[in-house]
Amino acid sequence: MNQTVTENHRLRDTIIIGAGLTGLTTAYYLTRKGCDIEVIEQSPCVGGQIRTYHENGFTFESGPNTGVISHPEVAELLAKLSPTCRLETAREASRQRLIWKGDRFHSLPSGLFSAITTPLFSTKDKFNILGEPFRSKGNNPDETIGELVQRRLGISYLHYAVDPFISGVYAGDPMRLVTRHALPKLYQLEQTYGSFILGGIAKSFSHRSERDRLATRKVFSTYGGLSNLTKALEQAIGIKRFSLGAISTSLMPCEQGWVVSFTDSCGIVNRIHCRKVITTAPAFALPSLLPFVPDKQMNRISNLTYAPVMQVSVGLRNTYGKEFHAFGGLIPSCEQKTVLGILFPSACFDNRSPEGGALYSYFLGGTRHPELLEKSDDEIIRLITTGLNEMLDYPAGIVPDLIRIFRHKKAIPQYESSSTDRFAAINELQKQYPGLVVAGNLKGGIGMADRIKQAVEIARER
């Protein structure tokens, strides 16, 4: 008589929870070292927030559109995955960034002459910036980005350079994000050199190793979209190492290490005994994932604000002769527009739209306007089509050939004033429970490059 299997027990050396970019990259490098690993993922597919769609000749993303090669680990990973996954860097012409002021977009200055003549910044601040190298450096470790920039550069640089940049990266408020956590390189420029300008000059003359030069800071994707990156990682790791569609996942410490429990897509309870666990889950998922951690201790880790973001992919087969040779346009919050920014993927990469067409990615919401995610699809479509006319100068009443709306209610973690205590609490927890690693974008940076770098460092230490 056949018995129905209701529980499945097995042994592993290391369990990785989460098959986003951090989890996949960690699993990839551990697998290359010969470690016996398994990746547990709630979704039925890998990739986390990264998801590429192909529809009617358009290739668009529902999550991150691009990364920046800001760490050598990015170039090294993509070189290892080639030719299964091929690096695609943005066209040189798309290096231009646009900032909205008044009734149109203006180019962000890229040289001395444009910095002097730009209408984005006030005459007062243009003169005041000459004194930036002589200003005292700050002594508040939790100074926000907004406070730092206003102190060193002036209010117009905050409004028309840094604020839109923060909207584009964090969908957040520069007056709430702590510089040393959200923009650590900017913080270190002031702390090390006493000045952004002097620090930038010193950095440009500093010796860089051959490996350091791999960090070109170029904007990148992969040919065919970023899902090709996560699929290549999945293929290299091996599908048998994944448990997808897992629910009710939790872990408990035991004498020999850890027991990871979850219910799989067939309804079978799995219990895996392992030596180490690496979690890449978001902060809000940790209370149920780590039930053995007391509430007071857990609250220090899980009280992380996430910016809600709506991304709208807009495709046009007929561009009416318009060409935007830029990465995209950002809208400062002081301009009081509904849109945070518009990326121009088809200006950056090949085959993102049919020949002669264009693809745009609109971003709305953020920490300042979370209510926009509650608007209906019809309301959003009206807003977008109006914006095509008012902001990109397309004919009034134009109907896009493609509109796809993606709502992410907890999209981007905000490294605010609670971050210092959060990072300390994570370190304390890891020391208290050897073999546990708390990773993911709740610490160490939110960009794709940060995720890859963190994963490489974790795999190196295992």
Region roles according to the model:
Residues 2, 7, 109-113, 324-326, ...:
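Conserved flavin/dinucleotide-binding core of flavoenzymes
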Residues 9, 33, 244-360, 367-374, ...:
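Mid-domain catalytic core of redox enzymes
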Residues 12-39:
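N-terminal Rossmann-like FAD-binding beta1-loop-alpha1 element of flavoenzymes
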Residues 22, 45, 284:
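Conserved Rossmann-like nucleotide-cofactor binding loop
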Residues 31-55:
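Glycine-rich FAD pyrophosphate-binding loop
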Residues 52, 75-97, 156-160, 306, ...:
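A short alpha-helix-loop-beta-strand transition element characteristic
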Residues 56-137:
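Dinucleotide-binding Rossmann-like beta1-alpha1 core, especially the glycine-rich loop
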Residues 131-251, 257:
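Active-site/ligand-binding neighborhood in enzyme catalytic cores
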